[in-house]
């Protein structure tokens, strides 16, 4: 007697085990930079506060996130056809941020999503609500707040400065622009 089998996924276990695929604890920083660039941003701005409780805020002036569900859907990037064809995004970059922080709040395009990491890992429903008007600067379309990240300020700035070296858009850390000596626009003008 024969039988058949099909590939299947144990979704909760997959989500929890994904943290082991992000072996570098600073990967989420370059992933968030890449998302800002893909969204058409002209800058990505990082602000870090070790005191309250190791909080990192990431802001950009790109197109924003049209559907916040895409942030928490594995293998669904939400990028338009042009980005999909040119860069083949995996739809997993934001998951690296999920594993980097204890709590995350996202403000984008007038909407707000706020959750604890464990809520997301347990696949509990997370409310999307209207974002308060004063929740972000006027030059920002997306603001991501990461609370309780397990990095020091020195580790964060080192990773951001390394990633910024050849990055296509301006990168700021705590109000100061990071050097981009290998960025295309700098190479063309030097």
Q: Where are the regions that the model predicts?
A:
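Charged, alpha-helix-enriched surfaces in structured cytosolic catalytic cores
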Residues: 23-28, 66, 92, 151-155
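Bergerat-fold GHKL ATPase/HATPase_c domain
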Residues: 1-41, 68-73
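A conserved short beta-strand within the histidine kinase catalytic ATPase domain
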Residues: 42-49
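Structural motif
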Residues: 43, 55, 103-105, 112, ...
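Acidic ATP/Mg2+-coordinating residue in the GHKL
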Residues: 60
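Short beta-strand-loop-beta element adjacent to the nucleotide/active-site pocket used for signaling
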Residues: 49-56
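Flexible ATP-lid and adjacent glycine-rich G1/G2 motifs of the Bergerat
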Residues: 63-126
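N-terminal assembly/transducer modules of large multi-domain enzymes
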Residues: 2-7, 37, 124-190
